[in-house]
Amino acid sequence: ISVGVSSQNLWLGPGQFSSLLMYSNPPGFNHFSIGTNRPLKTPLGSVEFNIIGGTLTAIERQGFENRNLKYYGNFLGTRYLSLLSISYNPVFFKNFYLTANRAFTLPTQEKPSSKLTDYYLIALKPLFRNVYQDNTAAIDQIISGFAKYVFPKENAEIYFEYGWNDGSSNLRDLTLDNSHSSASILGIKKIQP
């Protein structure tokens, strides 16, 4: 298990040229992390996890590609980030990986309380939003999951990632309206030796 403080930029997801949750184009941000530096072996397979909490600051000088687009809401202030990533490699299906990611951002002005778990570690709270928060706070939840299969002899992998940018109220809401504000990535990656 590793614990760290950093300001590096992060990439999260299997995509080679794009990512649904976090990509390394913007500058780094101040954050702390707790996670595994190598897979933890269990009888059912290997598990890796990473918990990240930090602050994001908007860069006001960067504009949109389309000049007619405007910022909506409070995007120019500082926001808290809470992120949880868990990866599983089953012992019975070698070279196959399943990963679940969950991230929250909330404006620093709307900090729900002074407890660390309510803003930096909010990603550890229950999945459905009516359990942990009302809908009045400007909290943004992003969830993604991906599967990838690695072909070691060919130095290649195939992957699929699916994510959405809205917290569900319950299991029924998740299953009936899972395409609301969703995105997906499908790809094949080949590394030339």
Predicted features and spans:
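Well-ordered mid-protein domain cores that form the structural environment of catalytic cofactors
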Residues: 1-49
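Long, repeat-rich segments with strong aromatic
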Residues: 132-184
